[in-house]
């Protein structure tokens, strides 16, 4: 029997429109279970290697990972004692975190398209992974 993903409630701190969390060996990510939530999630794994399971797709990453996970797309956490990752940074935001109409303006069409593609998950590679990852890791 295939387990159903658990629903995760994401609650940004008061006065914030998104959440930011960073995990490492001293502060491990406790959400290693198969789960989903309505928020879009951007995950940067600094270093290490491991398995990523997003939706029905299972694959492996090396030398870190940068993933954009769409709304309600089931996935597992990426850092545990076996991966050797230095850290994992997670940004979670609702699709309308910048307002209901922000992504409808012409200048945001490509970002809106990226969010739609992310409904199946997007893994970034090469210099994009490194450049964006460094900016996420505060």
Region spans (language model):
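A hydrophobic/aromatic-rich effector-binding and dimerization subdomain
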Residues: 2-17, 73-137
């Amino acid at each position: 029997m295939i387990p159903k993903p658990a629903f995760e409630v994401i609650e940004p701190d008061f006065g914030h429109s998104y959440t930011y969390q960073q995990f490492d060996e001293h502060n491990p990510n406790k959400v290693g279970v198969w789960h989903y939530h309505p928020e879009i999630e951007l995950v940067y794994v600094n270093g290490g290697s491991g398995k990523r399971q997003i939706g029905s797709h299972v694959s492996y990453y090396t030398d870190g990972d940068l993933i954009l996970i769409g709304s309600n797309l089931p996935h597992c956490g990426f850092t545990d004692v076996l991966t050797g990752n230095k850290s994992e940074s997670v940004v979670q935001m609702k699709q309308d975190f910048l307002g209901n109409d922000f992504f409808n303006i012409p200048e945001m069409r490509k970002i809106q398209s990226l969010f739609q593609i992310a409904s199946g998950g997007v893994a970034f590679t090469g210099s994009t992974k490194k450049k964006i990852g460094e900016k996420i890791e505060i």
